[in-house]
UniProtKB/Swiss-Prot annotation:
Participates actively in the response to hyperosmotic and heat shock by preventing the aggregation of stress-denatured proteins and by disaggregating proteins, also in an autonomous, DnaK-independent fashion. Unfolded proteins bind initially to DnaJ; upon interaction with the DnaJ-bound protein, DnaK hydrolyzes its bound ATP, resulting in the formation of a stable complex. GrpE releases ADP from DnaK; ATP binding to DnaK triggers the release of the substrate protein, thus completing the reaction cycle. GO terms for molecular function: ATP binding; heat shock protein binding; unfolded protein binding; zinc ion binding. SUPFAM superfamilies: Chaperone J-domain (SSF46565), DnaJ/Hsp40 cysteine-rich domain (SSF57938), HSP40/DnaJ peptide-binding domain (SSF49493). This is Chaperone protein DnaJ. Residues 28-47 are annotated as: Disordered. The keyword Nucleus does not apply. Zn(2+) 1 binds at C147, C150, C200, C203. Homodimer. Pfam families: DnaJ, DnaJ_C, DnaJ_CXXCXGXG. The gene is dnaJ. It is found in: Cytoplasm. One of its GO terms (biological process) is protein refolding. Residues 5-70 form the J domain. It comes from Herminiimonas arsenicoxydans. Binds 2 Zn(2+) ions per monomer.
Length: 374
């Protein structure tokens, strides 16, 4: 049975910090500890599973190997002295050697594998105004930097890495799997061809340290929710001289207090008074670029929509501005004075006398009700 992903076990993403990993493990350990669940075999299995995931992800060197090669990078039973993988694994390694290893690995049969660095993702939340007009900002991204103590060698200062004793410095081992003789990434040096008998204490032999990197991001005007901006070369560093991965900044737009966005169009509700709806007149409305106005006709009903062309958002791809749709909401007056109530009662009587002339929808509705009960 295939082993579960260590990050999935802890309920975390691959960008999780060391503190988040420790916190998630403690929570699961408390929940599934055998002493708290003496009669549950399932709880014991989950406890062991969480413990293994924590042991791997809390160690920088093991975590780096797992991030790059999956379980094969941290399982001593997968590779090394023969045996191991099944028929599908054999073919996977054959085709990997011909076309390049998964994840961007490449290299000759006699040398260490070269791997492209992993891509990173960063979620950035911005306002609707920033999305409409464009926005320049800086972000801090968790990333790996070369260890300053050992200059990236992974070896304790004053010592040097030596050729891996398992692969002889080639970064690969040849394994016999049935009728096939195949090359696999060395499980001891993880393809680097080197090992550190005296690892650097600052980076635990990884040659790199995780820290926040500050980057400038230019967000183009008109960008929409869910779009991504690629920052080439700002992902994780490659291995054995491989190129770095890319950083993808995924945009999330905050909900606006007034406008709702649909593509490049904007929608908003415009409350107007009962008198304004009846008499008509000019309405002033806000837009993302200042104020605008339009005229509503006499007798405007609640729910009527007015379209203001090119008052929406200029599309990041099309270059054309969308429209602003204003949905009128006729507001019923509240907290009236006696004088106002008196005038409204008089108005109501005049309206009744006028019949369908003043309230055609009310007359129509009353006729339908009458027919319904007859």
């Amino acid at each position: 049975m295939a082993k579960r992903d260590f990050y999935e076990i802890l309920g975390l993403g691959k960008n999780a910090s060391d503190e988040e990993i420790k916190k998630a493990y403690r929570k699961l350990a408390m929940k599934h500890h055998p002493d708290r669940n003496p009669d549950s075999k399932g709880a014991e299995d989950k406890f062991k599973e969480a413990k293994e995931a924590y042991e791997m992800l809390s160690d920088p060197q093991k975590r780096d190997a797992y991030d790059r090669y999956g379980h094969a990078g941290v399982d001593p039973n997968m590779g090394g002295g023969g045996g191991g993988g099944g028929f599908a694994d054999a073919f996977g390694d054959i085709f990997g050697d011909i076309f390049g290893q998964a994840g961007g690995g490449r290299g000759g049969r006699g040398g260490p594998q070269v791997y492209r660095g992993a891509d990173l993702r960063y979620n950035l939340e911005i306002t609707l105004e920033q999305a409409a007009h464009g926005y320049d900002t800086t972000i801090r991204v968790p990333s790996w930097d070369s260890c300053e103590t050992c200059d990236g060698s992974g070896a304790k200062p004053g010592t040097s890495p030596i050729n891996c004793t398992t692969c002889g410095g080639h970064g690969q081992v040849r394994m016999q799997q049935g009728f096939f003789s195949v090359l696999q990434t060395c499980p001891k040096c993880h393809g680097s061809g080197k090992i550190n008998p005296s690892p650097c204490t600052a980076c635990s032999g990884a040659g790199k340290i995780k820290r926040n990197k500050t980057l400038e991001v230019k967000i183009p005007s008109g960008i929409d929710d869910g779009m991504r901006i690629r920052s080439s070369g700002n992902g994780e560093p490659g291995m054995n001289g491989g190129p770095p991965g890319d950083l993808y900044v995924e945009i999330r737009i905050k909900q606006h207090a007034m406008f709702q966005r649909e593509g490049d169009d904007l929608h908003c509700e415009i409350p107007i008074s009962f008198a304004k709806a009846a008499l008509g007149g000019e309405i002033e409305v806000p837009t993302l670029n200042g104020k605008a106005s339009f005229t509503i006709p006499e007798g405007t009903q609640s729910g009527k929509t007015f379209r203001l062309r090119s008052k929406g958002i200029k599309g990041v791809r099309s270059g054309y501005a969308g429209d602003l749709f204003c949905h009128v909401v006729v507001e019923t007056p509240v907290t009236l004075t006696e004088k106002q109530k008196e005038l409204l009662r008089e108005f109501e009587l005049l309206t009744i006398e006028g019949g369908s002339k003043h309230s055609p929808q009310t007359k129509s509705w009353k006729d339908k009700v009458k027919e319904f009960f007859e």
